[in-house]
Amino acid sequence: MEKPAIIIDQAFNMRSGFSGEEEPRSVLTCLVGRPKMTWGCGMECVDYFIGSEAEEKSGILIIKSPLEDDGHIDDFDDIEKIWETIYSKELTINPEEHSVLIAVPGDTKEIDREKIACIMMESFNIPNLYIANKHELIMVKEAKSDGIIFDSGEKVTSIIPIKEWKEIKGQGEVYKFGGKNVNEYLIKLLNHVNVCLTTREEKKIAEEIKKQMCYVALDYEAEINKKQDNEYVLPNGDKIKLKNTIYKTGEILFNPSLIGKEEEGFAKKCIDVIQKFDSIEDKKKLYSNIVLSGGNTLLKGFDKRFEKEIKGLVPAEMKENVNVIAKENRENSAWIGGSIYSSLPLMKDLWLTKDEYMEYGSEYANTKYQKK
């Protein structure tokens, strides 16, 4: 019996797992840490640490990600180490027995696709490879052929229009702003209530506060006038009053002026992308399928506020078409889309096989994918 394909979503929080399953088996922080100095023989000689192991030893390591903020690969030697960890420690499988679907940004360069193919085929000796557009996979997960994706993750937010299952090149926008920036603003606000979080471990407390306590107000001005009686218990047992921190944190997604940025919020940015289209029908389709994706959109109340902002800003004739789709597990949307897509019968004609790679070389990765 053929073994299931492996799905890898290329992102700062790299999700991996098996084709046909409903959620990833692993979420690995895409970090590689190396010792700041050479260790003596008395210590275990390890050249590098991956993911949470690197974070736990941050005091004695130089840590970096092999991915750029926008999700493109910056260091192929280190990304190979990440993939090796996925195979050997996260999924504990033999790569030679599983096909691989990798979800990458739609504007990934051809030479980078070829390097991915080269590493997967030669270093891991996989039988088949498919390099997929992660935003197209999000629409597969939603079963929507047309729409606009608002995908906000750890470090980047993308607004990408999709038509007939394909990303429309040159029409989307990508911003280097995501959950990391929201966390940094939260930490700044916490300083105002005498809570100082500076170390990597302490900053994880801010992440927990955001998940448990913070929300996006439906009406920010009205929220300011409400009395805030809230309390959070720190790991050491101390209790803190968060006050307006709980609703101000996520407000920067709609009101960047709070952090000194003179630009529009993301709802207006989304409208600007849709309004680039000349066709009324195209605009209607996009407004009727605004798909939220990525962990940064999980902030409580974000979806309702986003829809309210869109409806308040769109041309009057388009208001009734506005529909914001905010499904559960949307932090896993691209991975789930890959799990579904790789299970379809049509994939048998789309895989780049090992034989094709050996005959035509890594360049065929681009040639074959362009035919799909």
Report the location of each language-model feature.
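Conserved phosphate-binding catalytic cores of ATP/NTP-utilizing and phosphoryl-transfer enzymes
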Residues: 1-4, 112, 127-150, 166, ...
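Conserved phosphate-binding loops in N-terminal lobes of ATP-dependent enzymes
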Residues: 2-119, 128, 158, 168-171, ...
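A short acidic Gly-Thr/Ser loop motif
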Residues: 6-13, 142-144, 149-158, 162-166, ...
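Phosphate/ATP-binding catalytic cores across multiple sugar-kinase/actin-like superfamilies
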Residues: 81-90, 239, 248, 252-286, ...
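Glycine-rich phosphate-binding loops at beta-strand->alpha-helix junctions
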Residues: 103-112, 214, 218, 288-309, ...
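Conserved phosphate-binding/catalytic loops in two-lobed NTP-binding clefts
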Residues: 131-134, 307-339
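Phosphate-binding glycine-rich/basic clefts of nucleotide- and phosphate-handling proteins
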Residues: 163-262
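Acidic, glycine/GT-rich loop-and beta-edge segments that sit at the periphery of enzyme/chaperone cores
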Residues: 196-211, 215-229, 233, 325-372
